[in-house]
Amino acid sequence: MHYPEPISKLIDSFMKLPGIGPKTAQRLAFHVLDMKEDDVVQFAKALVDVKRELTYCSECGHITEQDPCYICQDKQRDRSVICVVEDDKDVIAMEKMREYKGLYHVLHGSISPMDGIGPEDINIPSLINRLKDEEVKELILAMNPNLEGESTAMYISRLVKPIGITVTRLAQGLSVGGDLEYADEVTLSKAIMGRTEM
């Protein structure tokens, strides 16, 4: 179907978001058309502000308004423990449980040869540099319990073992194939308390 160019561009833009197909993108585009102009301007500003005002922490890779992030700046944190997660949503899930008091390292993905994503395409090199520079005693691998997460955890474990740092994995109880961000706080808390050495 042929749409006016502004609608077509908006549909194409919405389709760049994960999980948004052509029908959903079309529905969203027409919803925007029906919105009040002030709401549309506010929505567009929020999109632009996210890109302009947020950056990634130079230490851990977590999203932040200031560098380093509030977690890396917190002197009360246990700097001898780093929890490695796949993305920012995992940090937020871990912080909600209020049990973990160490630092984080965000990979921004996982190793997935089928998708052409190798170790050099995610935040692994900066993790290794960080481990050489800091007094880290334990590295907790909190990858999602799926094939990509397991592959990433095994790869990091093999890289880190020779450095002499204890590498642990979250305890099972997280459903295989699930995402860490969707685990409830009790399950996540038990997984961190029952972590095992790799």
From Swiss-Prot:
Domain Toprim: 80-175
InterPro entries xrefs: DNA_Rcmb_RecR, Hlx-hairpin-Hlx_DNA-bd_motif, Rcmb_RecR, Rcmb_RecR_Znf, TOPRIM_dom, TOPRIM_RecR
Zn finger (C4-type) start-end: 57-72
Family matches, as Gene3D superfamilies: 3.30.60.80, 3.40.1360.10, 6.10.250.240, RecR Domain 1
Keywords for this protein: DNA damage, DNA recombination, DNA repair, Metal-binding, Zinc, Zinc-finger
Disulfide bonds: none
PROSITE patterns linked: RECR (PS01300), TOPRIM (PS50880)
Any GO molecular function: zinc ion binding
Pfam family, one: Toprim_4
Gene Ontology BP, a term: DNA recombination
Function: May play a role in DNA repair. It seems to be involved in an RecBC-independent recombinational process of DNA repair. It may act with RecF and RecO.
Family listed: Belongs to the RecR family.
Protein name: Recombination protein RecR
Lineage, highest ranks first: Bacteria, Bacillati, Bacillota, Bacilli, Bacillales
Gene name of the encoded protein: recR
